[in-house]
Curated annotation (Swiss-Prot):
<keyword id="KW-0694">RNA-binding</keyword>
<dbReference type="GO" id="GO:0003724">
    <property type="term" value="F:RNA helicase activity"/>
</dbReference>
<dbReference type="Pfam" id="PF00271">
    <property type="entry name" value="Helicase_C"/>
</dbReference>
<keyword id="KW-0963">Cytoplasm</keyword>
<keyword id="KW-0698">rRNA processing</keyword>
<dbReference type="InterPro" id="IPR001650">
    <property type="entry name" value="Helicase_C-like"/>
</dbReference>
<feature type="region of interest" description="RNA-binding RGG-box">
    <location>
        <begin position="523"/>
        <end position="545"/>
    </location>
</feature>
<dbReference type="GO" id="GO:0000184">
    <property type="term" value="P:nuclear-transcribed mRNA catabolic process, nonsense-mediated decay"/>
</dbReference>
<dbReference type="GO" id="GO:0003729">
    <property type="term" value="F:mRNA binding"/>
</dbReference>
<keyword id="KW-0866">Nonsense-mediated mRNA decay</keyword>
<keyword id="KW-0690">Ribosome biogenesis</keyword>
<comment type="similarity">
    <text>Belongs to the DEAD box helicase family. DDX5/DBP2 subfamily.</text>
</comment>
<dbReference type="Pfam" id="PF00270">
    <property type="entry name" value="DEAD"/>
</dbReference>
<dbReference type="InterPro" id="IPR027417">
    <property type="entry name" value="P-loop_NTPase"/>
</dbReference>
<feature type="region of interest" description="Disordered">
    <location>
        <begin position="544"/>
        <end position="563"/>
    </location>
</feature>
<dbReference type="GO" id="GO:0000380">
    <property type="term" value="P:alternative mRNA splicing, via spliceosome"/>
</dbReference>
<dbReference type="InterPro" id="IPR014014">
    <property type="entry name" value="RNA_helicase_DEAD_Q_motif"/>
</dbReference>
Amino acid sequence: MSSYGGSGGYQRDSYRSGGGGGYSNGYSNGHGGGYGGRGGGYGGGGGSGYGGGYGGGGYGGGGYGRGGGGAGAGAGGDRMGNLGSGLKKQDWDLDTLPKFEKSFYKEHPDVTARSQREVDEFRKKCEMTVQGRDVPRPVETFDEAGFPQYVLSEVKAQGFEKPTAIQSQGWPMALSGRDVVGIAETGSGKTLSYCLPAIVHINAQPLLAPGDGPIVLILAPTRELAVQIQAEISKFGKSSRIRNTCVYGGVPKGPQIRDLSRGVEVCIATPGRLIDMLEAGRTNLRRVTYLVLDEADRMLDMGFEPQIRKIISQIRPDRQTCMWSATWPKEVRQLASDFLNNYIQVNIGSMDLSANHRITQIVEVISEFEKRDRMIKHLEKIMENRGNKCLVFTGTKRIADEITRFLRQDGWPALSIHGDKQQQERDWVLNEFKTGKSPIMVATDVASRGIDVRDITHVINYDYPNNSEDYVHRIGRTGRAGAKGTAITFFTTDNAKQARDLVTILSEAKQQIDPRLAEMVRYSGGGGHGGGYGRWGGRGGGRGRGGNFTASNAAPLGNNRRW
């Protein structure tokens, strides 16, 4: 998608960042008085609010979804299932394929001059381990990385002091043309680890001819992460006139098709929508010589493995592949061994699942019914500082909407983001949160990776996630870029099966452990999951069609302004 606000975005010869005022204009005056009348409550009439109210009986006759529910079938997103069945099998004859350049790394004299002991000490200090044959030495400054001046000047203009650990080792690895696996926590600077070598790679290739597809393909699990990667590529590729587009579901295909047909050197995509484009003949992957799989573990968690395999089958086998992941489970290892050749690997931090040590983790063992009161108590304290930002995670989209409505009616400036929201609403919510206009964002796990808001100070896990990996990723939204953060987690007896893993993570990070949590570990084995949607009866039917905004984000703020 070209930019957020639909204002032209990244066209062939113009690099407008697009979308500047796109959000606010698109939504009249933000919260202002723009919500109009609410019709007959949440379920009754549509009301005259945002473009036809909340979509008629969106919340199902009366109750929270006991009745027929709205017509809403979600906002699109990436289809699963039979995607890719229309793709032709490629027979690659490497002898007839055009040759391409992928090795650009020349070791800086300062790097060569270091003794092996100095290299080992640097790696130890950065908690870095490497594997594979002939792994290049890490660089300690931007100048040592050997980037061309047009890349270096842009990096320095951003005010970075020195490379992060993953960049120190990742840049020489990627610039050398080798296949690379990088394992590092989210927020460690891995996007630049592959973006800058990608720009060097593109500039060494022949120019695109009409009808050519991209040279660099970056696959990402979510729309949010894809847009964030696009922002980095745009920033650093500007001086080389590198064009890019972002291809993801949940938005109209028109602008994406237009960008692809004009020609782009970089395509950032979620797997489902990219396969749609390939099947429709809107682009091809014959020119791709630099492939990136970002957050590979997350893509596999989300069930994208069949699509990833189909996409890779369309790319020449002598390409360079870089795979980035926050964890290294067996499924990710299998993917690496299937698609990477003679790869070299860098790990930052422990190979065991561990949380960022700059995050204070507070776990409270409470009942389901205490959660709302506890959340309000914490928010009262958190929001004493106007600069704080709080991300609240829930287990389901329904609870995300309920809590957002509850908070707004209680006077808190909260908005929610999840997979059933239209893309433009998600973009708008994210922007309100980033700019601090709405410092409380309620989210499901779709937002737990790839949302790059650097200054989140607090995370509240209203519902505990299904596994400890997701717990670590959720709390990793705070404490980024060297800052400290706080994560507050509500843990109920329904979560007892997860207690042991959680205690392991807390102990490793030297955090206090609630005695009731320790007790649960001793007696766990029971617990299990309660009866589905519990208190409110059936799930009801999504959002209803119609209004531009879902009811939760359009709920008026109560008179008792809390912030």
